[in-house]
Amino acid sequence: MRALWIVAVLLVGVEGSLFELGKMIWQETGKNPVKNYGLYGCNCGVGGRGEPLDATDRCCFVHKCCYKKLTDCDSKKDRYSYKWKNKAIVCGKNQPCMQEMCECDKAFAICLRENLDTYNKSFRYHLKPSCKKTSEQC
């Protein structure tokens, strides 16, 4: 549990209910979320933007788009509840916006798991200024 708290602290600046998001990624992928996704590609982590480099990076792009659609909540501060039940994420009974945030994070963690085979270690600490602008909109 202490390691997950450290993960949450290291993710400061990344949108969302950080502690829960970090746990979801760890549970779904078995990977350390900060080390493996904190600066991955063009769209993961703080300041991410640009044309996705691969399917893993596209997960981050879609996640940011999902957050842009949230209503009446602060994706940087509000916290939601969820459970890890039978190796599946189950969002708890939350207020509407926090429920939406939980669903965004759940879809993101599942997307990362489903695209583990595209994960490219050379994109792990990718320099954002080298990312090409994308015409793709949310």
Curated annotation (Swiss-Prot):
Alphabetical list of Pfam families matching this protein: Phospholip_A2_1
CDD domains: PLA2c
Site feature Hydrophobic membrane-disruption site (MDiS), where: L127
BP GO annotations: arachidonate secretion; lipid catabolic process; negative regulation of T cell proliferation; phospholipid metabolic process
Disulfide bridge map: C42-C131, C44-C60, C59-C111, C65-C138, C66-C104, C73-C97, C91-C102
UniProt site positions, description: Cationic membrane-docking site (MDoS): K128, K133
Record localization: Secreted
Segments of this protein annotated with the region Important for membrane-damaging activities in eukaryotes and bacteria: 121-133
Keywords per UniProt: Disulfide bond, Myotoxin, Secreted, Signal, Toxin
Tissue-specific expression: Expressed by the venom gland.
One Gene Ontology CC term in the entry: extracellular region
Signal peptide positions (record): 1-16
Positions bearing the site annotation: Important residue of the cationic membrane-docking site (MDoS): K121, R124
Molecular function terms, GO-annotated: calcium ion binding; calcium-dependent phospholipase A2 activity; phospholipid binding; toxin activity
PANTHER family linked to this entry: PHOSPHOLIPASE A2 FAMILY MEMBER, PHOSPHOLIPASE A2, MEMBRANE ASSOCIATED
Quaternary context: Monomer.
Protein purpose: Snake venom phospholipase A2 homolog that lacks enzymatic activity. Is myotoxic. Has a strong indirect hemolytic activity and anticoagulant activity. A model of myotoxic mechanism has been proposed: an apo Lys49-PLA2 is activated by the entrance of a hydrophobic molecule (e.g. fatty acid) at the hydrophobic channel of the protein leading to a reorientation of a monomer.
Family indicated by similarity: Belongs to the phospholipase A2 family. Group II subfamily. K49 sub-subfamily.
Protein name (record): Basic phospholipase A2 homolog acutohaemolysin
